Amino acid sequence: MRLYRDTAVVLRLHKLGEADHIVTLLTRQFGLVRAVAKGVRRTTSKFGARLEPFAHIDVQLLPGKNLDIITQVQTVDAFATDIVDDYSRYTTACAVLETAERLAGEERAPAPQLQRLTVGALRAIAEQARPVEFVLDAFLLRAMGYAGWAPALEECARCSAPGPHRAFHVAAGGAVCTYCRPAGAATPSPGVLDLMEALLRGEWEGTDSAPATLRTQASGLVAAHLQWHLERQLRTLPLIERSRPHAAVEVDLSVRQDGTRDSTTRTANSA
């Protein structure tokens, strides 16, 4: 069996035996890969801290029957150094990793765009170039675009009527016009959907001056839209202060007796 190399982001670790780790990687060419790092928990390990979550690495692997084996590791970016010492950056980066793993799908399904988005988000968090809530929301919106779940923000999600539209409904797919608006649709404050569109497109100019109320509502809608499609909540989002349920935006996901999901998006202005 031939060795192979790839660049990867370390998503998470699991202990294996007394000295090993199972490492979950998001690689550029092969998507999700689970591999064993032998002896990594020993103080004499040749891998050192290079196989910690948030690390961007160049890795050499030996294919195995169930799990590959990591044979060499070189650090490309040591993002963890600037992430783990700050709670906000740490929890935000954890949400990025969890989302990336959930969206990557099956093991060994190539996901180069998702890997690039993940590396870019971790770099922005580590460098503190922008508010972490904007980095996370921009990542989530773009990652949903990669998965085919990007919310409609400029035209009606149901009839494609050009906007701007005021209402937003998660199950409908995003912004909805007056005629298509379902019961329970949210009516976010003016500027919220524009802020989400700017984050999706990477148009950062002016985002820093967005009022806190708009940021909160945008974050709530982004998280709700993602979790509707994932069908269950991300474990890491409740750890992030701005992602907790707010009076401004709250989404109730429930399952009807016929097994279909019901979504009601509420805001302070819900009708």
Curated annotation (Swiss-Prot):
The molecule here is called DNA repair protein RecO
- Keyword Acyltransferase part of the UniProt annotation: no
Give the organism the record lists.
Rhodococcus erythropolis (strain PR4 / NBRC 100887)
Output the GO biological process annotations, alphabetical, semicolon-separated.
Answer: DNA recombination; double-strand break repair
Family, similarity comment: Belongs to the RecO family.
Q: Where is the signal peptide?
A: none
**Which residues are listed as membrane-spanning?**
none
Q: Which domain of life is it from?
A: Bacteria
Tell me which Gene3D superfamilies the record gives.
Nucleic acid-binding proteins, Recombination protein O, C-terminal domain
Keyword DNA damage listed: yes
What is the primary gene name for this protein?
Answer: recO
Keywords for the protein's UniProt record, in alphabetical order: DNA damage, DNA recombination, DNA repair
List the InterPro entries hit by this protein, alphabetically.
ARFGAP/RecO (IPR037278), DNA_rep/recomb_RecO_N (IPR022572), NA-bd_OB-fold (IPR012340), RecO (IPR003717), RecO_C (IPR042242)
Q: What does this protein do?
A: Involved in DNA repair and RecF pathway recombination.
Gene Ontology CC annotations of this record: bacterial nucleoid
Provide the coiled-coil residue spans: none
Q: Name one Pfam family in it.
A: RecO_C
